[in-house]
Amino acid sequence: MRSHSNQSPEMLETGTELMPDPAELSTTDYSEHTHNAAPTRFVEVDGIRFAYRRFGKPMGEPIVLLQHFMGNLDNYDPAITDALAMGREVILTDNAGVGLSTGEAPETVVGMARDAASLIDALGLEYVDLFGFSMG
């Protein structure tokens, strides 16, 4: 497992908030947000700042939607993600080195899986459902 930074919230140049506390993240109600209205947030894991969005009803297992190789968190159709969010929490993310996430894009599927597991850990989530397509 990788460690995440425990920084205090701060506003970044883009106007999005760096979210530091996984305990708070796993108990926050994201039901007010939709795919396009949810703020893009960031969590740092081993020097990589991962961009993600969380929205939907915080009931049951959250679903983490993994991206294809160079896809970003806006590649999923909002009509689909918003429909999923009516019954559960949805988490969209950019892979390392893609979109708003920093670092280098992993060269292997194993590397992508490690990054996804590290992000899930950093968000304080014990159990999730995963959904992906292509290399996601």
Model-derived segments and spans:
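Conserved HGGG/HGGXW glycine-rich cap/lid loop of the alpha/beta-hydrolase fold
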Residues: I48-T102
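Alpha-helical elements of Rossmann-like donor-binding domains used by nucleotide-donor carbohydrate transfer enzymes
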Residues: A38, N75, A79, G111-S118
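Active-site loop->helix "elbow" adjoining a glycine-rich segment at hydrolase catalytic centers
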Residues: S134-G136
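Active-site loop/oxyanion-hole signature of alpha/beta-hydrolase fold enzymes
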Residues: L92-F131
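Alpha/beta-hydrolase fold catalytic core
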Residues: M1-I63, M86-R88, L125
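Detector for Asparagine
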Residues: N6, N36, N72-N75, N95, ...
